């Protein structure tokens, strides 16, 4: 067999494959044997029908066509391997020449991974926001914590912002009552904005027993987009009374005995969260800089697949919250064209980032050991709320394990670049990024337990392939580090422990 590769573009090639009939003959013979078992001919036992009889019954041309179709996947695969083509799409195959007893010639066009030429990065410089925490931020956090321990006391006065009211609600559209839009005794914090548009303005200044009617646009349900007439009856007004900010409050709200100890702990936790946010900012800016420095074309099929996947995820999420695409775009204040252009740009950036990081993996010979992979499985299983061994088996059954391994490799490549970068804040101060480290102790024992669930063959590191989750693992690792740190602190201060790294634009 002879294969010739023609480069059509940086992301597309054409293979021309010539197969002598002698090399095709084993496939032809195998097809005759298969048909001899399938075709029933009087006077011949199954599997004993001679080729000449099959030719008479089915036609020599039909049999040769079937032999070629069954041989093409193998021949194509051999040609791809021989020419070392990194395929990213289904091939478009065309048989250009074939006659009985003569050679088979076919072509195959496919999208391929573009060649990425990495520049000498040197010491890349990134500028991020400072990780400082102000006194005002600490006090704001303490106020939020006090808010969680507030008590509600009935008052006999008109409704004010910040009050909690008990409401009876009903709604109608064009005089027709909406059955599933009624509520009795609903508690609502005035001014929070988490009920329906217009409710705050309608009940402002109302007293216990007052009835107010207003119009609002429905954003979900059967009457989405319609204007509804809503009636709200105030059934009680309560004001929120915050506890004094003193040592007694510190004892009640935390493990600390004094207010100063609590205040210091809140500052430490906020600083930890800011370091995680700082890492997320550095990560995103590194990806932006890589795309700026390295020109990478995006294969059409890969971009189309990514856009389709994103549209599918969006549709699933919108269905889950009970709304549609048009309403969602209206909420964003974007036209369909603007939204699609933004998604397309983001998807292209994600794919380019993947290709560049994959090139870094190759250039730096970045590898992956079993322990690193198992740590990721353990972490993701915990976040998914399933047993680690069950999560590992689910990955092994499909292509999830391959995708996870590629993500971890890309994460390592990104962190290597961050380690070698010069990072300063906007005030010119050097920044030491809070890069995650390997776990120890009990975590290592858990990792070893999970590894028993996967065969060694399943842990062979694949060539990094395009994935919609280009740098998700980078965010996951940083989040895991921050979460582990927060878990060691007993203060449950209104989200101080929730240090999720902002999702990368490439995720």
Curated annotation (Swiss-Prot):
Where are stretches of biased composition, namely Low complexity? Answer: 461-488
Q: Where in the cell is it found?
A: Cytoplasm
- Does the keyword section mention Cell cycle? yes
Question: What is this enzyme's EC?
Answer: 5.2.1.8
**Species annotation:** Parafrankia sp. (strain EAN1pec)
Can you state which reaction this protein catalyses?
A: [protein]-peptidylproline (omega=180) = [protein]-peptidylproline (omega=0)
Q: Where is this region: Disordered?
A: 434-507
Keywords, comma-separated and alphabetical: Cell cycle, Cell division, Chaperone, Cytoplasm, Isomerase, Rotamase
Q: Which SUPFAM superfamilies match?
A: FKBP-like, Triger factor/SurA peptide-binding domain-like, Trigger factor ribosome-binding domain
Its family remark reads: Belongs to the FKBP-type PPIase family. Tig subfamily.
- Keyword Cell division listed? The answer is yes
Specify the PPIase FKBP-type domain's residue ranges. 162-243
One GO BP on record is: protein unfolding
Molecular function terms from GO: peptidyl-prolyl cis-trans isomerase activity; protein folding chaperone; ribosome binding
Query: What name does the UniProt record give this protein?
Result: Trigger factor
Task: Spell out the disulfide connections.
Answer: none
The organism's taxonomic lineage, starting at the top = Bacteria, Bacillati, Actinomycetota, Actinomycetes, Frankiales
Provide the function of this protein. Involved in protein export. Acts as a chaperone by maintaining the newly synthesized protein in an open conformation. Functions as a peptidyl-prolyl cis-trans isomerase.
Give start-end positions of Acidic residues composition bias: 442-460
Record's Pfam families? FKBP_C, Trigger_C, Trigger_N
Q: Name one GO cellular component term.
A: cytoplasm
Q: What is known of its domains?
A: Consists of 3 domains; the N-terminus binds the ribosome, the middle domain has PPIase activity, while the C-terminus has intrinsic chaperone activity on its own.
Broad class of the protein's primary localization: cytoplasm
């Amino acid at each position: 067999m002879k294969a010739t590769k023609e480069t059509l573009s940086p992301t597309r090639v054409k293979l021309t494959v010539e197969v002598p009939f002698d090399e095709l003959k084993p496939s032809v013979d195998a097809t005759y044997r298969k048909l001899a078992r399938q075709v029933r001919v009087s006077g011949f036992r199954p599997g004993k029908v001679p080729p000449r009889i099959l030719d008479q019954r089915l036609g020599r041309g039909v049999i040769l066509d079937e032999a070629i179709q069954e041989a093409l996947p193998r021949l194509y695969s051999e040609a791809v391997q021989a020419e070392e083509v990194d395929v990213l799409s289904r091939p478009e195959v065309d048989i250009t020449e074939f006659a009985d007893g003569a050679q088979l010639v076919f072509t195959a066009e496919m999208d391929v991974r573009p060649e990425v030429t990495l520049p000498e990065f040197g010491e890349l410089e990134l500028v991020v926001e400072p990780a400082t925490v102000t006194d005002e931020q600490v006090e704001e956090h303490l106020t939020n914590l006090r808010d969680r321990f507030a008590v509600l006391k009935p008052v006999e006065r008109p409704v004010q912002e910040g009050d909690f009211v008990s409401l009876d609600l009903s709604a109608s559209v064009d005089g027709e009552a909406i059955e599933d839009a009624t509520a009795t005794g609903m508690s609502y914090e005035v001014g929070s904005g988490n009920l329906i548009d217009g409710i705050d303005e309608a009940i402002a200044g109302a007293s216990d027993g007052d009835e107010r009617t207003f119009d609002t646009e429905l954003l979900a349900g059967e009457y989405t987009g319609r204007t509804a007439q809503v009636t709200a009856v105030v059934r009680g007004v309560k004001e929120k009374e915050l506890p004094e900010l003193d040592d007694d409050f510190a004892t009640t709200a935390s493990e600390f005995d004094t207010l100063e100890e609590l205040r210091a702990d809140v500052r430490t936790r906020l600083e930890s969260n800011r370091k995680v946010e700082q890492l997320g900012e550095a990560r995103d800016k590194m990806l932006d800089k890589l795309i700026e420095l390295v020109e990478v074309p995006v294969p059409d099929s890969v971009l189309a697949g990514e856009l389709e996947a994103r549209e599918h995820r969006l549709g699933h999420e919108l269905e889950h919250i009970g709304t549609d695409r048009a309403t969602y775009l209206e909420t964003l204040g974007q036209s369909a064209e603007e939204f699609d252009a933004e998604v397309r740009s983001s998807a292209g950036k994600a794919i380019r980032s993947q290709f560049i990081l994959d090139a870094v993996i190759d250039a730096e010979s970045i590898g992956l050991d079993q322990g690193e992979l198992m740590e990721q499985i353990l972490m993701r299983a915990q976040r998914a709320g399933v047993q680690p061994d069950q999560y590992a088996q689910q990955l092994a059954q499909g292509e999830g394990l391959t995708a996870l391994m590629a993500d971890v490799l890309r994460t390592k490549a990104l962190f290597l670049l961050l380690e070698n970068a010069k990072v300063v804040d906007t005030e010119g101060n050097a920044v030491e990024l809070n890069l995650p480290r390997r776990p120890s102790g009990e975590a290592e024992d858990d990792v070893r337990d999970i590894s028993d669930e996967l065969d060694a063959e399943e842990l062979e590191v694949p060539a990094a392939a395009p994935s919609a989750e280009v740098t998700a693992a980078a965010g996951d690792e940083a989040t895991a580090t921050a979460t582990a740190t927060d878990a060691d602190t007993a203060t449950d201060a209104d989200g101080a422990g929730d240090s999720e790294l902002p999702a990368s634009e490439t995720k």
